[in-house]
Amino acid sequence: MRVIRDTEAIKEQLLGCGKTAVALGAFDGLHIGHRAVVRAAAESGLTPVAFTFRDNPAEHLGGGCRYLTTMEERLRIFAEWGVEAVIMPDFADVAGWAAERFLNVLRFGLSAQAVACGADFRFGKFAAGDAAWLARSCAQRGAVLHVVDTVCYK
């Protein structure tokens, strides 16, 4: 499994992977909801990729949260789930991106034809992008978006 930390080098480091299905999220503990997002990406028949962060976004946004699993554990679990590449920049490096720039990285850097995220996924500067915005933008560009509902354990 490839681990890519430099967002400027994504396209070069994914050479040979072809078109991708990208699972988006902080993936703080890799629970069954996260697995559903990765599974939705993998079931598309494209190269499964996860886009997450080396550090928890909540740490930068005043939440003070930590990951429930270590980076090594997350990478091992992603590999077990069949993810072929993990894009894992520092959150600070992408926090200022406009939602449109984030979409362009997915489309052109990752060659994403399918994207999967949770219903509560937010992205872009000031969390300007959400699942509804992403759905419209993907549809306009011929990509498929899978929004995974929140999973509750009873």
Region roles according to the model:
Residues M1-K154:
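Nucleotidyltransferase catalytic core that binds NTPs
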